[in-house]
Design a protein with these regions (language model features):
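Structural alpha/beta core scaffold segments of enzyme domains
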Residues: 1-213
Length: 213
């Protein structure tokens, strides 16, 4: 990174270049049109290059040493303690099943960090598996820990909530988890449900589902 009196040049792997340009302009006082990002292929980001503090720290150092190129590289230990953490959250899912084991109602409650994308958690369950009745509620909680987008934003947590719950429902219904999921998808009216069924069938076939371990 190089900051002069009238220009900023940044070489970085960045998933949010506009935010980085804005930060550079704010810190240095140099107009955004004179902030130049040179995006580099620097390995995977997995979210950490989306809104982490690493670019701003380098901008601060370069601004204090104008005219001198600055290359900042964290050690692995610094990386763990100096950047943002994965957002936290908890979820409670409940369902009422009919006499055949199929859900007639589902309730999804989530509590996630106020900066986490928790508002979609309930919809994420409903967008996969059919039930005639749903109730969603999401609560934002301040954990006072710097968090950022990591490993697919909110998808990993929501997938864990949803699929763990589906396994529990299939077990309570005495059904095969794969067939249980397949039927619930088929009962829905999503325009892409056929693609979801094909993907599920393919996963079952590739994993040799149902064979002894």
């Amino acid at each position: 990174m190089l900051v002069t009196d009238d220009r900023v040049d940044i070489w970085v792997g960045d998933q949010s270049p506009q935010e980085t340009r804005h930060s550079a302009s704010r810190i240095t006082g140099i107009p955004e049109e004179n902030v130049h990002l040179h995006l580099c292929h620097l390995g995977g980001g997995y979210g950490r290059n989306g809104n982490g503090p690493q670019a701003e720290q380098t901008i601060l150092l370069a601004n204090q040493n104008r005219g001198t190129p600055i290359h900042m590289l964290w050690t692995r230990e610094e990386d763990f303690v100096s950047t943002t953490y994965r957002s936290m959250g908890v979820a409670r899912l409940r369902a009422a099943l009919d006499e055949d084991g199929w859900p007639v109602a589902m309730e999804v409650k989530t509590a996630m960090d106020e900066k986490a994308p928790g508002s979609t958690a309930g919809f994420d369950v409903a967008s996969r598996y059919f039930a005639p009745n749903y109730r969603f509620s999401t609560h934002s909680v301040a954990f006072h820990i710097p968090v950022g987008t990591r490993r697919g934003v909110g998808a990993p947590a929501m997938n864990f909530y949803r699929e763990s719950f589906m396994n529990e429902l299939a077990h309570a219904a005495g059904m095969d988890p794969y067939q249980y999921r397949r039927e619930l998808i088929a009962r829905g009216d999503l325009p892409y449900k056929n693609d979801m069924i094909k993907a599920l069938d393919m996963a079952a076939e590739m994993s040799d589902w149902g064979s002894p371990l």
